[in-house]
Amino acid sequence: MHKLFVARSVKSALFRIKNHQKPQFAAFSTSLLFDDTQKQFKESVAQFAQENIAPHAEKIDRTNYFPQDVNLWKLMGNFNLLGITVPEEYGGLGLGYLYHCIAMEEISRASGSVGLSYGAHTNLCINQLVRNGTHEQKQKYLPKLISGEHVGALAMSEPNAGSDVVSMKCKADRVEGGYVLNGNKMWCTNGPTAQTLVVYAKTDVTAGSKGITAFIIEKGMTGFSTAQKLDKLGMRGSDTCELVFENCFVPEENVLGQVGRGVYVLMSGLDLERLVLASGPVGIMQACLDVVLPYVKQREQFGRPIGEFQFVQGKVADMYTSMQSSRSYLYSVARECDSGTINTKDCAGVILSAAERATQVALQAIQCLGGNGYVNEYPTGRFLRDAKLYEIGAGTSEIRRMIIGRELFKEQ
């Protein structure tokens, strides 16, 4: 494990042992999921997120903007959270997806919006560059993305091409020295602020899935602009917009992977995208319990805390088991990916399960708080609105079910 995290975590742990203190930000029953180093990493990230991200969560949601008064990207970069799976030669930690999922969970626990933007930056953009970029591309783009100096994004979907990626209309015409892009991309997370974007466009409109190519787009390229920032139901502080390409020239060296192999680039990273993003709803479920448990212990009706009533205990038990089963599934799949086995049906399965359970857990959190749960002074409404995104983004629940069913059928 990276020495920076070891030093911070061990020092923190020794301090608590000496002073007989319990970890302030520990999650429930992780002893079966992590070794000591992984637990220390989780605790270290949890403390960072609760101190630096959680205090801004309400304002992020209310103002519909990623924080402007504090540079969270630089803070996360300084804490080495932006290059967890990146090889050390490019400035990363050289760790696996289990550690990446831990960080994504704890950041999402502090703020769903920041968690989603973090996932888009580190997994959709950085991970695609690591997996498919040339040495020169990695040297050029990764250091600034890992430090937080630059923000990353990925753009695949279009107004009329979501799950049906091959139907995209954005074109890339070959010219001397590169390509000229024309078209639009929709629902691009981090789009308004990103300096480095992975964008998919058709280089051969007659070749179907073999006619799509991935490009590295830089903010400021002539002909590239961002349109309106979208006003979303949830994940409001995760800035999202439409991208516009009007005769945008992209040099040949900015092709990511091979020409005509864009679908391979996309699909080869999609399983890992689903895995890492599945940490988001797990973090939201933890946030729900962080609010509900103290509330039902303090809130009194009929002369005693409502947490003593069996109906409330039943709801809390359901929330807890939903979270823990999703968490166990998540880290089991992450561990398998780190061992070299990337299972498509389980990467789809873990986000399908976690996303739908997170929506239900958030609904139960609102119910446990009663009237207060329906008031925006409390964060439970935000949890629900944020959780719902994960049933839609990175492939809808319906697409995930189709993938799982198809893979199971192929195995017979």
Curated annotation (Swiss-Prot):
Catalysed transformations (reactions): 3-methylbutanoyl-CoA + oxidized [electron-transfer flavoprotein] + H(+) = 3-methylbut-2-enoyl-CoA + reduced [electron-transfer flavoprotein]
Cofactor(s) recorded in Swiss-Prot or TrEMBL: FAD
Active site residues per record: 273 (proton acceptor)
Chain sites annotated for binding substrate: 163, 209-210, 264, 271-274, 394-395
GO molecular function: 3-methylbutanoyl-CoA dehydrogenase activity; flavin adenine dinucleotide binding
Pfam family of the protein (one): Acyl-CoA_dh_N
GO CC terms of this entry: mitochondrion
Positions bound to FAD: 154-163, 187-189, 299, 310, 367-371, 396-398
GO BP terms: 3-methylbut-2-enoyl-CoA(4-) metabolic process; isovaleryl-CoA(4-) catabolic process; L-leucine catabolic process
Transit sequence range: 1-25
Enzyme Commission number(s): 1.3.8.4
Keyword Electron transport annotated: no
Major localisation: mitochondrion
InterPro entries the UniProt entry points to: Acyl-CoA_DH_CS (IPR006089), Acyl-CoA_Oxase/DH_mid-dom (IPR006091), Acyl-CoA_Oxase/DH_mid-dom_sf (IPR046373), AcylCo_DH-like_C (IPR036250), AcylCo_DH/oxidase_C (IPR009075), AcylCoA_DH/ox_N (IPR013786), AcylCoA_DH/ox_N_sf (IPR037069), AcylCoA_DH/oxidase_NM_dom_sf (IPR009100)
Record note on quaternary structure: Homotetramer.
Name by which UniProt lists this protein: Isovaleryl-CoA dehydrogenase, mitochondrial
Species, as recorded: Solanum tuberosum (Potato)
Upper classification of the organism: Eukaryota, Viridiplantae, Streptophyta, Embryophyta, Tracheophyta
